[in-house]
Swiss-Prot record:
GO terms for molecular function: L-serine ammonia-lyase activity; pyridoxal phosphate binding; threonine deaminase activity. GO terms for biological process: gluconeogenesis; isoleucine biosynthetic process; L-serine catabolic process; threonine catabolic process. Pathway: Carbohydrate biosynthesis; gluconeogenesis. The modification N6-(pyridoxal phosphate)lysine is found at residue 39. It is found in: Cytoplasm. Its EC number is 4.3.1.17. It catalyses: L-serine = pyruvate + NH4(+). This is L-serine dehydratase. One of its GO terms (cellular component) is cytoplasm. Keywords: Cytoplasm, Gluconeogenesis, Lyase, Pyridoxal phosphate. InterPro entries: Ser/Thr_Dehydratase, Ser/Thr_deHydtase_PyrdxlP-BS, TrpB-like_PALP, TrpB-like_PALP_sf. CDD domains: L-Ser-dehyd. Its main location: cytoplasm. It comes from Saccharomyces cerevisiae (strain YJM789) (Baker's yeast).
């Protein structure tokens, strides 16, 4: 049986101890994707579509190249394994050994180069891919987030949510918001694409959650145009992009989306609390969105409306494999999280 590059994930009503007697929250569990995060959708879609095009042109199978210190590289490796493609992933020196092993275990060749993602990416594109092209191979560069075909793949999450709500006899007007974490804007862009395709982009507001220290979207909004962050300091390393995709920035204003910025301390506290409550370990990038489940007053404030008993909010638990429970405890201790 052929492996697929992504799976339909559960949309589960979860009750949070947040002072409300009834839960509004339905959580979409993208941590259950083959690559451990939502990135399996978009990156897998890009690789599959590009490989099919290469085969139809008679170019043979692709050689796939990804630069990522984390979840994008793992998603690329996992997708390539499902299609029997060679995959090379360049990671910076800051990448944790356990993540390197995860990517290797998924069948990819891992090269460690550079002090940050930018240096790893430059080495991948200008050195490794150039060498491979000289050998006559058809190559594919996989950006972690800024690619329209990747957004197309991510947009399937909206189609699934609509289908799952229908299966539970939940009408779409009951959905008052969709919450997702934002780094470079790949997931956000996919959600906007999916909502727009289903004529919902102007009906369901998207709440974009970032952490202070890598809040490039929020800073860009305040600036009135996209900015580039010179330094990324948040513990939510999977959100640490120096820039926001142009489509994400433009869509935010077009569709009346909302921006929330949280502290590292708040997000780490939520990650530990969620692990204790549900036995799910989520990294800070994912915990950022889940934080609003424990603190619905933030959501009501940003939406400028009360959320009532019959209303529903969708939370995208984006997943990620960058931190263990021990990592969360250590980071919490360092930042004096109570």
């Amino acid at each position: 049986m052929e492996m697929t590059h992504y799976e339909k994930t559960p949309l589960i009503r979860q009750v949070f101890n947040n002072g409300k007697t009834n839960s509004w929250f339905y959580v979409k569990h993208e941590i259950l994707q083959p690559g451990g995060s939502f990135k399996s959708r978009g990156i897998g879609h890009l690789i599959r579509k590009s490989n099919e095009e290469a085969l139809s042109e008679g170019s043979g199978k692709l050689a796939v190249f990804s630069s990522s210190g984390g979840n994008a590289g793992l998603a690329a490796a996992t997708a390539c394994r499902s299609m029997a493609l060679n995959c090379s992933v360049v990671v910076p020196k800051t990448t944790k050994p356990r993540m390197v092993k995860k990517i290797q275990s998924a069948g990819a060749k891992v090269i460690i180069h550079g002090d940050h993602w930018g240096e790893a990416d430059e080495y991948l594109r200008h050195k490794l891919m150039a060498q491979e092209s000289q050998h006559g191979s058809k190559t594919l560069y996989v950006h972690p987030f800024d690619n329209e075909t990747i957004w197309e793949g991510h947009s399937t999450i909206v189609d699934e949510i609509i289908e799952q709500l229908k299966e539970n006899d939940i009408s779409l007007p009951r959905v008052k918001a969709l919450v997702c974490s934002v780094g470079g804007g790949g997931l956000f862009s996919g959600i906007i694409k999916g909502l727009d395709r289903n004529h919902l982009a102007e009906k369901i507001p998207v709440v974009a959650v970032e952490t202070a220290g890598c809040d490039v979207l929020n800073k860009s909004l305040k600036n009135g145009s996209p900015v580039t962050l010179e330094k990324l300091t948040s513990v939510a390393t999977s959100l640490a992009s120096p820039y926001i995709a142009s489509f994400a920035f433009e869509s935010f204003n077009k569709y009346g989306c909302k921006s929330v910025v949280l502290s590292d301390q708040d997000v780490l506290a939520t990650c530990l609390r969620y692990a204790d409550d549900y036995n799910f370990i989520v990294e800070p990038a994912c915990g950022a969105s889940l934080h609003l489940c424990y603190h619905p007053e933030i959501l009501e404030d940003i939406l400028e409306q009360k959320i009532y008993e019959d209303d529903i909010v969708i939370i995208i638990a984006c997943g990620g494999s960058c931190m263990t429970y021990e990592d969360l405890v250590k980071a919490s201790s360092t930042l004096n999280v109570s």
